[in-house]
Structures are given as structure tokens and as C-alpha cells.
Amino acid sequence: MKQKPAQPKGGQAKGGTQVKAAAPSNARWGLYTMAAIALWIITCFDNNGSYFTQKMVGVLCTVGMLCVMLFAGKDKVKRLMTPPAFALAAYMLLSAASTLYARSRKFAIAQFAVLLASFAVYLCIVLFSKDGKIAFRRAAGTIAAAAAPVGLLSIDAASCNILMRPVRVIMEAVGAGYGNTGAYFYSRLNTILGNPNTYAGLMSIACLLSLWLVITAASRSQKILCTVLLMVNAVSYLLAFSMGSLGVFVVACLAMLVLSPSDKRMDLFLLLVQTAVVALIVGAVSVKGFGDDVTGSFLPIIMLIAGCAAACVLEIFVREKLVARLADKGKLLIGLIAAIVVLAAVYLAAALNVTGSYTFGTESEFRRALDLPAGDYTLSMQADPSATVRITYKNTNNLVQNNETDLVNGASDAPVTFTVPEDSKLVFFYFGGEPGATLSAADYTGAKDGSVKLGYKLLPAFVADRIQDLTANGNVVQRGVYRQDAIKLWKTSPVFGRGLGGFENGVVSVQDYYYETKYAHNHYVEALCDLGILGLAAFLAMLGTSVWALVKSRKEKPLIVMLLGACVLQMFGQAISDVTWSVGCCLPTFFAVLALVTLHCGDCLKLKTPEKNKGGAVRWPVTVVSAVFIVLISLNLIAQSKFSSDSLTLDDLKQCASIDPFETNDYKLSYLISGGNEEDVASRYAADLSHVESNAISIPLAQYYASVGDYTKALDQLDRGAKYTRANASVWQKMFDLYEQMIDPVGSSIGAAQWLQDDTYVKRMVNGYETLCQVNADQLDDVLLTDANNSFLNKLLAVNTLDPYDFVEALTTFSTLGLDTAYLPDADGNGVPDCATVQEGSVTWGENGAFTADTDSVVTFAAVIKTDGDYDLTVQSSASVEAAVGDTAVALDASGKSTQPVHDLGDTENAMTITLRVPAGTTVSHVTYMKK
């Protein structure tokens, strides 16, 4: 009796012939389901959770990691004796060490907690997953399945909100972070993770895994399940439309094709085409069910279900047969690829030019962009019933700062005129209308004639919107600025870096204009900044050893290498432009992929160790570091719980500062501003904080020093804070607020007058103003002060001119001066007083606040008047002018002085305005508003 030849383990016979794998038991199905749920929970809470939530997840995962390392068998621990594992371990150890020397240990431990949770995922896969093709497939399916709910909930959250509503309640109950995320769609899916680009980093890996699962499915039921999984991941990935991620994804798919065995290449190619076509159709129709807020529309979910069904039908009844017919026809594959490239080029050309009217749906506006030459234009719109337009432009500075400058607002009921400046790079049109309104034409005439392309008939609306500014994209330019600033920070600590969170903490100290970002948007530069040359070397080693392991394993495991090669390319490729290696939504999945590389490809590089070796070189370092950080993070969580309690006392703050090495600065600062006055404790805390590099400590610490009468140290802290956060207008405004509280005797402490006995502090504060002027001269953007700041500076600059300095005159100036144009601040250095505005007409400004009207003009001056009383307005001018204080007209005599005093009640919060109507040719040389 003939026997069938034995099949090798893993479900694949010699020559690559696929065989049916044994179905997993119910217990194993339950285990994989629990693993997918656990990975999903870690992903969600590590991404959107508060720092407290991230650290809680991190410490729980670290406890699990400790148990795993203690009880894992020696053979399993030896799986880590391979270069890919060593590289990742080096990166983790450098990150761990950096939390103890980081400039901001608060940021560092939160970031490291995410890394700890991700490393726990890595160890669980390496130590508990079996080493075989079936085990690999199950692990890949678990990772892809963990991402699918994120995609499904993201689509639901921005449309019908049925699934996300109960999930949101549960997530918020466990930890804040999901209050309203994902509830809108503007040009792309915002996603429940709150960032389409990092979400795309997660879903791109899920899509690659899902593609591989479909082409390696051993049964029809597996194909159907994996096809549904693929469509959920692919549609949600496409709707996020992260152009950087999609660009890398295309390259990753090409790499997957190149690396795939010849008998799978046509299979994969047809699956890629099928998935792309179905996902594009589903996405294009689904967009109509999204809007600026939750729409309640079921269309996106219905289309997703329909897309899954269509893909399953195509998979079973079309693609399978095509694959069978086209097998072993490599030249045909090349021809098909060439044909698709040509068709794609033709389609793209047609899609960009076949346009028509635009009918508004649930979205309130859409944008279009044109590269228009400088000059005057008139825009005429045809709309039913009506539409609005807001026209803006971007110049080089706008691109760097990623903002726009408004030109004009208008409506379709009248022509809209606008002027494109000489330095314009791109002009944007934001059209708005009610749902159902149709904008049929938008024609412009002027320096160039033409029409704005409105409705792209062959492009999905979200794609049309995203491609508008490809030629002048502010995001791309601004990320270049982030990288440059990260390099500046790296130079302050080139070998070990500034510690995790070092970029977030220090970027304010090197900015040429104010912006807010936590990351450098390039992880190679981020690693260099945070962990120095050693950290970058470790990160590059992770990439290099992974590639090395894949190359060495390709002949033996071609199917596994084709997938992992594409995943590695995607992970490390998108790291060039996004923050995917810094956020909790991506890191657990990325570490899971690295675990698959270590387990299934790293064995070819495994170090040879004696049989008696128990893997202690790996086991004990990981165990010790895990135990140390379990203790440290637990102490941090205990301190944070006390700090957040309603019954917090000064003794609690001292205890928190003593047990928590990561957020001790917060407790010390809270102790000081809460009135802690134990002499040794308060002085020690203040001295400690005075040396901290922080973007948040200087102002409250200066307030503490001022409250105890140490004005010299208060001013030193303000100078230090202004230098460190030089581009932040809020810090400068608070700095001048504190100046005023310290030295202005009007409305402040009566004791403030003693600091006017001589001009020492006056000159220190004037020096602060001059520093601001220099900062504005050096930066791209100007730091402007509040009306209250400007009014205080008006008095301060007037006092500074007293020669010789006189205490009584200084007090009189602070008490009586409401406005004096001779001493108005001009922090931005444009020759115009910061409190002055030309409401109508045109004027030419001279020195000391004087100006000449070029045409009939209206000029206003804003001032904050602190004290109730009668005030005299005096306007010295070459001809008569009309004046008003607030809404009250003021009559002026021949000398320019008000004939009747103006009674001002005083308002320390709101500015009053002095309005002057000045005839053309008239020079106003001096304006004063003084208390009688």
C-alpha cells in the first residue's frame, strides 16, 4: 500500500507547495483573541492616555515582563542571544539610563513607559510564540486583528457613532483621552487616535500583514476572514490619507513583490490591484457620509460592509482563477505592471483636469489652491443659492511657520477683488456653503485670467483637497525647521543626548519663531537629540541587524522575509517624516514586528552558547532593569496620586519630592507657590529649581522670589526664562505682568514704591524690554505684548528718561500717566507704536510716536487705565483734529488740550481707546492722556 510522502512542518511541502495547516484548538483561539485585545488596549491607552495612564500601562506590562524573564526556560531565553535582540536591548538600556539624566525627567519617564509596554509585547512574542510557519501566521494575524478595531471605530466615530459611543464611555472611565477624538473629517479621517499620520503608521503595517495573510491562506474560510480584515484596515488607512505614509507604503509593496517567491508574485500583484480599486471606490463614496462633526450617517459603515463583501466575491470567484491562469507568466506580470503605470498616469492626468461644479455636502467648506502671479484680481462666483470665499496666500515665511496670510473675505453675490503680493508662493481659496448649495463657477480676471477648478469628477473629494498644496506644502517645510532645531539641541549634548523628551523640553530654547510640537518628525534626528550619537547608533543597529537577519533567511523562509522586509521598510521609512517611533499607537506593533524578525529570522545569527548556558547574560540585565523601574514608576504613581488628591498638604508635597525622582520639580514648585515657608526647605527647593532647564518653571519661581522680597533673584529668573523660551509670547507677557506687580505702586502692593528709591530695578526692566526688541529683530516672527504690558512699558520708559533720576517724579509718572506717545514701546521694531492702529487711510510714522497723515486717516491708541479719576487729553498737531476717548467725543482747544477733563473709571483688564481723525497732510507730534 502506497503512503503519501511526509510533509514538513509549517504547512508547506518542498518547492513551496502549500498545504492545509491544522486548525488551532478553541483554547488557542481564545489565547490569540486575548492577545489581540491586549495589544489593542495597550495601543489605545499608550497613545491617547494621560501620562498617568501611560505609566500605569507601562508598569503593569513591566511586571508581566519581569515574570516572563524569571520563569522562561533557558532555551526560550536563548532566543534573545541574537544581534536584532541585542540592538533593541541597547536602545532600551540607553533610553532607561536617559530617564535619570534627562532635562525633563517628567517627559522622559512617560515616554519610557510606552517603550516598556512595547518591549513587553516584544518579549511575549519572542519567548512564547512557537518557531514555525503556522505560529508565524497566527502571530501576524493577531497583530493585524488588533489594529482593525482602531480603523473600524475611526470610521464609525466620524459618521454614525454607534460603535464608538459605548467604547468612548468605557475608555474615558478607565483613563482620559478619548473625550471627542475622531469625531470629525476634514479632508481626511482624523481617527480615534487623534493624528492621521501616526495612525497611518499603525495601519500601514496592519495592511501589509493582512495582504500576506490573504495570499498565504490555506482554506477558503481563511481567505474570506483575511479579506475582510484586509478591507477594514485598507479602507481606514486610505481615508486617513497620510501622503508620507502612503508614499513609503507604495515602495514597501514593491519591495514585497520583489522579495516574494516567483509562484506568489502574480498572486500578490493581483491582490494589490484588487484591494486598491475596491478601497478607492469605498473611500470615494464614504466621504459623502463624513463631515466637520459626527454626521449620524450610516453610509461609511454600509460602504465598508459592501466593500468587504465585494472583495470576498472577487477573491473567491475572480482572483483565484486569474492567478491559476496567469501562474508562471513573469513577462506578462511585467507587462501588466507597465500597463497599470501607464493607465495610472493617464487617469491622473485626466483626474486633475476633468472638473465641474461642486455641491456642498455635510462639510462646511473646501479649499483650492493656485499659483498666481502678483497683481490685482477680481473673482466672480456663480452659486445656487449662495457661497462664500476666504482668500489667503503663503509666502516663504508662511511656509516655514505653516500658516497663511488673509487677503479678503467675500460672497458670491458680488465680485471679490484681491491683490496677490510679490512674495506669494501659493494662493488659497476657501469656499463655503450650506449643504446642498452648488458652486458652478469661480472665474478670476486680472494679472492672469482663468477659473478655479472646483469639483474633481474623477478624484475622491478628500484626495482632491490633500493634493492642493503639493508644490508649496507648509508641513514639509516646517518639518525641516523641526529637524534643524533638533540638531541645534543635539549639539548641547552630542554623545548621550538630552534624555527622552529632550526635544520637547528644549525646542523652545532654539526656535526662531514660536511653534508647538513634541517631536522632531524624524526619528533619526529625534534619537540623535534625545539619546545622542549612542542612541542613533542603537536605532540604526536595530535597522541594520533586522536587514541582516532578513537577508540571511531569504532562501530558507522566502514567504516570511517578503512580509517582514516590507514591514521593516515601512517602519523605518516612515520614521523619516513622522513621529511613529515616539507614540503609543505605533510602538507596540513595531516592537511586535521586530519580535517576529528576532524569532523567525534572527535564529540564523544566534550566538553559539554552551548547552549549560542558561541565558543569564540576557535574563538578569532585563530582570534587574525591569525591577528597578517597577519600583521607580510605582513611587512616581504613588506621588502623583497624592499630588492629585483633594486633601494635599505641604507635608505631602515634601514627601512626594523625596520619593519621586521624575516629577520632583513639580512638587517643589507647588510647595513654594502654595506658601511653604520652612526656611531650609523653601530655600533649598528654590535653589534647586533655579538651575533647571524648563519651559514652565521660570515665571512661577520668579513670582516666589518676588513674594519673599528677593527682587534680584526674581529678575534673574525672568531673564533666564525669557532667554530659554524666547519665542513664546505668553512667557514675555507674564514677565512684564510680573514687572508691573513688582514695581508699579498703582494697583500693586504699597511696598512697591520702595523699589523706585533709585533706578536700579527700572533699568533692569528696561533691559528686559530691549532684550525683547533684539529677539524680535533676530526672529522670523514677532513677539507682541498685551495692552496692559504696553501701558506699563509706556510708564517705565518715561521714568527711564528722568535725568537726573528723581523718586518723586517716578512716583508721579506711574500715578498720572495714561498715555504718552513720546515713550510708547515698539517691540517689533517696525517704527509704529505697538498700541497704535491705523483704522482708515494711510500715515507715515516718525520718531517718538509722531506721524503725518498721507490721506484723511483714523488712528487709535489703546491704553489700560488703572485708576479712577479725571484725565486731560492733549493732542499737539499742525492742524485741527477730531478726538474721542472711548465712545465719547472730546473737544480740543487751540493748543490741542481737551476743554473738559475726561472722567475715566479705570479698568485693569480692558483697554480704552483714544481715536484721532486726522486730515491729510496733518502732522501729530505728541499725544498725552494724563490724570489731573
Predicted features along the sequence, with ranges:
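Extra-cytoplasmic beta-strand recognition segments
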Residues: 362-386, 414-416, 420, 425-431, ...
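Hydrophobic transmembrane alpha-helices and their immediate junctions
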Residues: 222, 533-563, 729
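TM-adjacent membrane-interface loops and short helices in multi-pass inner/ER membrane proteins
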Residues: 162, 195, 460-474, 478-517, ...
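Loop-to-helix entry and N-terminal half of a specific, functionally important transmembrane alpha helix
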Residues: 34-39, 147, 226-233, 271-278, ...
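Membrane helix-loop boundary segments at the extracytoplasmic
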Residues: 41-51, 236, 526-531, 563-592
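Transmembrane signal-anchor hairpin modules in multi-pass inner-membrane enzymes, especially those
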Residues: 1-97, 103-107, 120-121, 127-144, ...
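Exposed low-complexity, polar/acidic, P/S/T/G-rich flexible segments that act as propeptides
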Residues: 433-461, 919-932
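Membrane-interfacial helix-loop-helix modules of multi-pass inner-membrane proteins that assemble, modify
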Residues: 149-201, 231-247, 254, 281-295, ...
